[in-house]
Amino acid sequence: MANFINMYRQLLSLPLSALVKNNPIPANPIEELSLNIHQPIVYVLPYTSQTDFVIFRRNCLALGLPDPAEKNEINGVKLPRYVYLDEGRRIFKSKGAKDETTTIFNKYLELHRTSESLDVQLIPVSVLWGRSPGQEDKSDLPNLRLLNGIQKTFAAIWFGRDTFVRFSQAVSLRYMVVEHGSDEKIAQKLARVAKMHFAKQRISATGPRLPNRQAMFNKLLQSEAIRRAIEDEAKSKNISIEKAQKEAYKILDEIAADVSHSSLRAVDRFLRWLWNKLYSGIDVQNSNRVRKLALEGHEIVYVPCHRSHIDYLLLSYVLYHQGLVPPHIAAGINLNFWPIGRMFRSWGAFFIRRTFKGNRLYSAIFREYLSELFHRGYSVEYFIEGGRSRTGRLLAPKTGMMSMTLQALQHSQTRPISIVPVYVGYEHVLEVDTYAKELRGAAKEKENAGLVLRVIKKLRNLGQGFVNFGEPITLSNYLSQHFPDWKEQNHEEKPQWFTPAVNNISKQVMININKAAAVNSMNLVGTALLSSRQRALSREQLLEQLSSYQQLLQNVPYSTDVVLPNVTPQAMLEHVLALDRIGVLIEKDNFGEIVRLERSSAVLMTYYRNNIQHLFVLPSLVASIILHYEAIQKDLLLDAIRKIYPFLQGELFLHFNEDELNVQIHQIINEFARQSVINSNDNFLSINKSKVRILQLWSAGTREILQRYYITVTILQKQPAISRAELEKESQLVAQRLSVLHGINAPEFFDKAVFSSFIANLKEQRYFDESGYTVLDKIEELASTLSHLISTEICLTVKGTIEKSEDLSS
C-alpha cells in the first residue's frame, strides 16, 4: 500500500507544481515560530488528503523543514513524521486515522519517559484552498471543509494561486509530559486540542460571512438610535419622516462597504504586480501577535500610522498573505471618486466625512454602522492621525474613532476588542514630492484617478516597504488596569472615566506605533546628511556616522519591537544611491569622494529622517549637552534632560517613564564611551576631540527642536500674560524668520501644530498658573537650560526678532 501511495503522490506532484504556488504562512516558520529543527518534529494535519500532503511537503522542503515523508528515528525507534486527525475523502483507505494518530502519540509519549533530553515538537499544519467566507444569504461554505478528488481538482485550477499552507505554533511534548503526565488520555487530549485549533483556524482565515448589504441597511435603519436620529432630523429641519428616512438611507449608502471576495482576489493579483513594479519587497514583522489574537477570538482593530494612500492597500495585502482576514477600512470621503471609490468599497473600505460636527443624523448612523461591524465580528482598520503625515512624524491622534470603539465595547460587545498599532514605513513614499510642495505653500491637489495613475507611472525602484505589528492593547484589560470601575458605570450616559480613557488609549497607540519603528537605509543616510549644515559629508565620515548609529541602536535598543537593517554601512549607502529620485549625489575631488544631498531634496529627506527621529532624540540630547558644555557632571546632565524630556515625550510619543529614562540615559552614555565618542570618568563626562565630529552629527538631531522650544519660552519671558492663541502665532512667525535667516529646511520647524503641542505640554507641566499667567521662575529656569544648548547666533536672532515684534506692536 505504501508503494501505491508514493506512486500516487508522484503522479499528483507534476500538475500540482504547475497549478499551486508555494504560499507558506508564516513565510519563515523556523525563525518566526522559533522551531528547533535539531529536535524531532511531527506535523499534525486535520484530515487525510494526498493532494494536501504533496503541497504541504513541497513547502516544507522549500523552507528547510524536515521532510514529512521520512520517519523520525529516536533511540533506534522509527515513527512517522506526520499524523492525520480524521479520515478524508480519499482513494486509499487504511485503519481509522483517529486510532492511528492516538497510537503514534502514545509511542512518542513513551519515548519521552525514557529519554529526558527528548522534546518532540507537534506542529499543526493545514492547507487552505481559497479564502472565501461565503455570503450571509447563501448556503455555500468556505473551501476549508473536506473536499473530494473532483472538488480538489477544480480547487487547484481555480484557487491554485490562492492556496496557503498554514504552519501553527508548535506544541512541546516534553511540556505536556511534565505538566500532564504521559498516559493514554494525554494522547487523546492532544488530538482533541488539535481539532479545536483547526476549527478556530478556519474562522481566523476566512472571517465571518460577508453581509447582505440591503439586509444590513434594513436592520440598522430599524435600530432605536437611528430611528430617534431620523425623528430629530425631521423635527429640526421641518421635513417628513419619509424624507428624513431617505436621507438616512443615502448616508448609509455613502458610508457602507460592499465587500466582494472575487474583487479581493483580483486586487491581490494587481497588488503583487504593483509591489513588484515599485518596491523590492515588503518586510513584515510580528504578525504572529495578530494570528494569536484571531485564534483566541478577539475582535481586532488595526490602527496604523498614515504615510501614504497606498497604506490602505498595503496592510490588507499583508494581512491576506499572513493568513488573516483583510479588515473593513475607514477611508476618507475624498477617496470616494470614480472609479477608485467603488473599487475601494468592494475591497472593504467604508467612507467617513472629515467632520461630523452639527450633523447628528450622520453621527448616529456612522456610530451604529461601526458598532454593527464589531457585533458581526469583522476586523476594522482606521487611521488615528486623521490624515497622512506630510512631515514623516506621527500626528496628534484624532480620538473620534477610538471613542466609538469604546462605546461599542460598552454596549454589549461580547468578544474582547484588541487594538493593534501598526508601523508602516517606506524607503520612498509615493506622494513625498506632493507633500514637499504642500509644505512650501502649494494648494492641496484634489484626489482623482488621473493623479493616482500619474504618480504610479513616474515611479519605480523605490526600495522596500515595512509593516511591523506593535504591542496590542486589549481594551477590557487596559480599562480594568487603569479605570477599575469602568464596568460599574451607567452605560446610557458618558461616564467620568470615558474621555480620559479615550485620550490615554489613543496616546498609548501612538507610543506603541513608535516602539515598532522599522529603521531602513534611507532613514539613516538621510539623518546623517541632514545633520551636516552643508548637507554633505566625505564618504569616510558618512560611513563612520552610519556605523555609530547602527551600533547604538543595536546596543541600546529603543524597544524590543524596533526593526533594524542587518547590512553594513557601505551596503546601506550603495542601496540608497541605487534608488530613483532621491537626490543623493557622489562628487569627487582631489581628496576623495563627497556624498551630497541636493538642496531641492533636503525637505524630502527630512521626511525619512523624521520617521525615526524619536529613536535618536535622547542620544542626540545627551550629545548636545556634552558638546556645548565640553565637560559636565553626569548629575547635571541628567537634571537638564529631566527638564526637557516631558516636552520631547509629548511631541514624539516616547515611552520611557522616569525610572526607565534614567536607565536609558546611562546606557547611552556607556555606549558613547564604548565608541570613544566621549570620555567618561566616574561622574564626569567630556568630549573626545578626536571623535568630536561624530558627536556634532549626533547632536544635530535635537538642534531644531530645542530652537523651537527656546522661541516660545523667550516670548513667555517677555510677555508672561500673552494668550495661548497669540503665543502660537508669534512663535510661528519668529520660527519662519529664523528658518529664512539660518537656512533651516525642516518642514515642521514653523508648523503651528508643534507649537500648539509644546504649549499644551507647558500647561500640563504647570508652567502656567490657574489663571493662565506664566510661572516666571520655572520658565526662566527652562530658558536658561535651553540657552546653553543653542548657538549664540541663534539666541541673538530669536531675541532680536522678538524685540522687533514688540516694537512694531507698541
Swiss-Prot record:
Keywords: Acyltransferase, Cell inner membrane, Cell membrane, Lipid biosynthesis, Lipid metabolism, Membrane, Phospholipid biosynthesis, Phospholipid metabolism, Transferase. GO terms for biological process: CDP-diacylglycerol biosynthetic process; fatty acid metabolic process. It comes from the Bacteria. It is found in: Cell inner membrane. Its main location: membrane. GO terms for cellular component: plasma membrane. Its EC number is 2.3.1.15. A motif (HXXXXD motif) lies at residues 305-310. Pathway: Phospholipid metabolism; CDP-diacylglycerol biosynthesis; CDP-diacylglycerol from sn-glycerol 3-phosphate: step 1/3. It catalyses: sn-glycerol 3-phosphate + an acyl-CoA = a 1-acyl-sn-glycero-3-phosphate + CoA. It is a peripheral membrane protein. One of its GO terms (molecular function) is glycerol-3-phosphate O-acyltransferase activity. It is an enzyme of class 2 (transferase). Belongs to the GPAT/DAPAT family. The HXXXXD motif is essential for acyltransferase activity and may constitute the binding site for the phosphate moiety of the glycerol-3-phosphate. This is Glycerol-3-phosphate acyltransferase. It comes from Haemophilus influenzae (strain PittGG).
